UniProtKB/Swiss-Prot annotation:
The keyword Ribosomal protein applies. InterPro entries: Ribosomal_uL13 (IPR005822), Ribosomal_uL13_bac-type (IPR005823), Ribosomal_uL13_CS (IPR023563), Ribosomal_uL13_sf (IPR036899). This is Large ribosomal subunit protein uL13. GO terms for biological process: negative regulation of translation; translation. Keywords: Ribonucleoprotein, Ribosomal protein. Coiled coil: none annotated. Disulfide bonds: none annotated. Pfam families: Ribosomal_L13. One of its GO terms (cellular component) is cytosolic large ribosomal subunit. The gene is rplM. It comes from Actinobacillus pleuropneumoniae serotype 5b (strain L20). Part of the 50S ribosomal subunit.
Length: 142
């Protein structure tokens, strides 16, 4: 019996919508990363993108435990000398709530071209509305 290897052109991808309201950030992100990679499928192949498309709504209502709301700090660099910037979780939720989930999931995906391809299948929206109704996404309860 030969080992099954999925081919990129034969992979069937589904669309799912996830409501992030009240979900813990890390627990949500691990499940999203797992599904973006395709590890929940029997035909999972490490070097082939077998994952599904995921739409996350209500990113502004994601929760963190403990004092992370004020203690968790996000850092980035502007590219200029001395341009290191930071913001707490609370400030990031106020400024750009989609980025909080995107950063968490991106860190859990493989680094390199395959990981970037997987990350492109994640669509995050701050509010309750998304513009992917034509794809007829199924509701995924995490």
């Amino acid at each position: 019996m030969k080992t099954f290897v999925a081919k990129p052109e034969t992979v069937k991808r589904d669309w799912y919508v996830v409501d992030a309201t009240g979900k813990t950030l890390g627990r949500l992100a691990t499940e999203l990363a797992r599904r973006l990679r395709g590890k929940h499928k029997a035909e999972y192949t490490p070097h082939v993108d077998t994952g599904d498309y995921i739409i996350v709504i209500n990113a502004e209502k994601v929760a963190v435990t403990g004092k992370k709301e004020t203690d968790k700090i996000y850092y980035w660099h502007t590219g200029y000398v001395g341009g290191i910037k930071d913001a707490t979780f609370k400030e990031m939720i106020a400024r750009r709530p989609e980025a909080v989930i995107e950063i968490a999931v991106k860190g859990m995906l493989p680094k390199g071209p395959l990981g970037r391809e997987m990350f492109r299948k994640l669509k995050v929206y701050a509010g309750n509305e998304h513009n992917h109704a034509a794809q007829q996404p199924q509701v995924l309860d995490i």
